[in-house]
Regions:
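Short Lys/Arg-enriched alpha/beta "domain-start" segment
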Residues: 1-71
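N-terminal accessory interaction module
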Residues: 45-123, 144-147
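Long, low-complexity repeat tracts used as extracellular stalks/passenger repeats
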Residues: 87, 132-134
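Metal- or metallocofactor-binding catalytic centers and their adjacent structured scaffolds
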Residues: 125-128
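A short, surface-exposed helix-loop junction/capping segment
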Residues: 135-150
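N-terminal donor/sugar-recognition subdomains of glycan-related enzymes
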Residues: 151-152, 191
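Charged, amphipathic alpha-helical linker segments immediately N-terminal to NTP-binding catalytic cores
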Residues: 152-185
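Phosphate-binding loop of NTP-binding sites
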Residues: 177-183, 190, 194-232
Length: 232
């Protein structure tokens, strides 16, 4: 599971380049191929020239920023492969946009590059702003701190933690928190979340479910299972 981010343009030594140093930057909104949790993942662009030192700097930049934001005690995964490398790390589920931008900055900085001043495609940015990788490292880290504080939703985290303590599923996207499943679920807009004591916990619970994964045949399999259950 993941959600793509718009990619900033690249600038190196004052020159605008035609490509970015990565080909995919994602928010990981749940369990994924790296770890069982939320976070961010970045894949280097095919053919990008980098060495072991750049890879170490990339990870070190991520660790530095995570420590600054208090995310130190979480997983970081680095994978090298034939065409490049990927780096993924766990992050608070309510701060995944800043996590993705942090990962992008960490790679830019590791390569000695900067993003252009093209505004980030962020509906919440008021006014539109450049990517943090447009600035020097100290300013980038300062901006990441501010962005994390703006994105954080402590009341959302508290509700999800309360649901987990009670063994009730809770799922949040960019707009809504739902607690429970199926007919035994209730949803709230993120800008109108209830107090923990106002949630009707006794009415909310999980339901039996089947998960279908794979690259081909998922829809057909789900339709087949649904038909079998209806006929049962």
């Amino acid at each position: 599971r993941g959600a793509r981010r718009a990619r900033p343009a690249l600038r190196a030594r004052g020159k605008r380049l035609s490509h970015e140093p990565f080909e995919d930057s994602r928010r990981l909104t749940g369990a994924n191929l790296y770890f069982d949790g939320a976070g961010a993942a970045l894949e280097t662009a095919a053919g990008l020239a980098f060495d072991a030192g750049a890879l170490q700097r990339w990870r070190a930049n991520v660790e530095r920023a995570r420590a600054l934001l208090g995310w130190s005690e979480t997983v970081v995964v680095v994978r090298e492969h034939a065409t490049g490398a990927s780096l993924a790390f766990e992050a608070p589920f309510d701060q995944l946009y800043v996590a993705a931008e942090m990962n992008e900055w960490a790679l830019y900085s590791a390569l000695g590059l900067r993003a252009s001043d093209k505004p980030v495609h962020d509906d919440d940015a008021k006014p539109p702003r450049p990517h943090v990788a447009h600035f020097d490292d100290d300013e980038a880290l300062h901006q990441l701190q501010a962005l994390a504080a703006m994105e954080a939703k402590p009341n959302l985290r508290a509700l999800v933690a309360a649901a987990r303590e009670r063994g009730v599923p809770a799922h949040a996207d960019d707009d809504v928190l739902s607690i429970g499943e199926g007919l035994a679920a209730q949803a709230w807009p993120l800008d109108a979340l209830p107090d923990i004591d106002a949630v009707p916990w006794s009415q909310l619970h999980a339901i039996p479910k089947a998960v279908v994964t794979g690259s081909n045949g998922k829809t057909t399999t789900v339709r087949l299972l649904a038909a079998m259950l209806r006929a049962h």
